[in-house]
């Protein structure tokens, strides 16, 4: 199942890079909120890590489960992005850009998960 040219693999990796860069910026800006920043870093990079792991899944069920974990992490990331925007940790431009990419991953993951047919 491994395919590095797969669009969701590429998009989730690019998103993880953006999250890491955002994290580095936030830590330089204000170290007092490090525990919150770590939450964003963990969930935002976990999306791509689980998608990558799904590429070596042992079965369709395993593949789907890894993608479900990625979807949960994407929803968590959406939460942290919204919280950071509402509390003025992220500016509107950065928030909108990251949120757009996060929502695209949510749509892609949802579509892929729905399309996976398992034997009853």
Identify the role of each PLM range.
Residues 1-53, 57-120:
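Short, C-terminally biased terminal segments at protein or domain edges
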């Amino acid at each position: 199942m491994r395919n590095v040219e797969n669009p969701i693999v590429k998009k989730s990796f690019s998103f993880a890079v953006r999250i890491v860069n955002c994290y580095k910026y936030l830590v330089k800006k204000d170290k007092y909120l490090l525990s919150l920043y770590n939450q964003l870093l963990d969930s935002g990079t976990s999306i791509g890590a689980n998608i990558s792991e799904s590429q070596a899944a042992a079965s369709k069920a395993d593949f789907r489960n890894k993608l479900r974990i990625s979807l949960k992490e994407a929803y968590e990331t959406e939460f942290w992005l919204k919280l950071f925007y509402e509390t003025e940790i992220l500016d509107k431009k950065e928030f909108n850009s990251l949120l757009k990419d996060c929502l695209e991953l949510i749509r892609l993951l949802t579509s892929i998960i729905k399309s996976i047919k398992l034997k009853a």
